[in-house]
């Protein structure tokens, strides 16, 4: 009996120290590993006492304590294990894990080890991106685009209708005057015979044309109503930064015998400076700087470009001065010229090789009041300016230069033509040389493409004879020049 007590005493001490050992053992391994996989032969020396009730304690391991929170007191007679608050929390956590596993169906997860505390839910709940949510903030780009498109369409309709109303208001106020001075008003050019339509011809949403003809000393008169691009939203926004005004341009083409040879222009300072640089006739025949018209009683805002002083004295009579003084704010430019060819023609290769075609023309440009905020009543205020156009046609027909003025005008035109020929002489020589080289190249290609050798030889001999004759002619000319020089 005494020997049995000595055998049981070491076993009891080992069992008391087992919880601490198992806690450290479980910490060294992952939770998913099964502790039962390890061999129990380490405790084979205690198999003889398997009938002892203490062995049952080994089969049912106590709760796993925290290593730092479970003090162990070794004593020869007894051992006590105290659980602190941390142990209770650990046991509560295990209970929560167990409750989570109980939610699953036992039949579906048959054979699954419920004691595995390392199981975690692998489902990942991702948040929906903000741009995929169904809210108005997700469509702000589409809303802006639709709003801009609607604004453009509304502005197009409103601007087009306003230009149409302004054009119709101008025509209604000027129709009686035009029909009393011209036999044909409003020919659209669609029919072979000239017919009076009595209405404006719309070129686009902001330009309207009116052709009039059938008057003494006048081939025809083209009136262009150049309104602002009110139908274009971008143009409307640009005009907020830089306001502009509508314009009415009148171009009268006279017969050759109904106008003398002179060039004259009057208008605002800015317009005269620009036209002198851009217009072909003003840059050639009016080389002097624009002069003030204070001598004739016109406002300082208007300047004059004239080929001769005699022309200015003849044009600026009392009635013409009255028109210019009363409507100086509406007059952009007035241009009379027998050499009118439009703006300068700039070619890529240089000066044009031919003088531009000229016509005797009267050109008027008027500004519509309002600076863009034009009303139909403002179009009625342009009627006196149309009376000035009719008066200018009759005035130019009656204006004739004296003998000295006529000779000076002819010398000016001869000088301009001579300067033009000098400027284009080198270009004409280069063009002639290029044509000769192209002709020779074409002749050589024709000879080389000839299949008959005999015919090819005859063509080469004929080409050589032509070249020889040309050389002989040049030599004869050189001899004649030397003889004349002697």
Swiss-Prot record:
The keyword Transmembrane helix applies. Residues 24-138 are cytoplasmic. Residues 72-97 have a biased composition (Acidic residues). Pfam families: CCDC47. PANTHER family: ADIPOCYTE-SPECIFIC PROTEIN 4-RELATED, PAT COMPLEX SUBUNIT CCDC47. Residues 47-99, 422-486 are annotated as: Disordered. Residues 421-486 form a coiled coil. GO terms for cellular component: endoplasmic reticulum; endoplasmic reticulum membrane; multi-pass translocon complex; rough endoplasmic reticulum membrane. Its main location: endoplasmic reticulum. It is found in: Endoplasmic reticulum membrane; Rough endoplasmic reticulum membrane. The gene is ccdc47. It is a single-pass type I membrane protein. The chain crosses the membrane at residues 139-159. GO terms for biological process: endoplasmic reticulum calcium ion homeostasis; multi-pass transmembrane protein insertion into ER membrane; protein insertion into ER membrane. Residues 1-23 form the signal peptide. One of its GO terms (molecular function) is calcium ion binding. This is PAT complex subunit CCDC47. Component of the multi-pass translocon (MPT) complex that mediates insertion of multi-pass membrane proteins into the lipid bilayer of membranes. The MPT complex takes over after the SEC61 complex: following membrane insertion of the first few transmembrane segments of proteins by the SEC61 complex, the MPT complex occludes the lateral gate of the SEC61 complex to promote insertion of subsequent transmembrane regions.
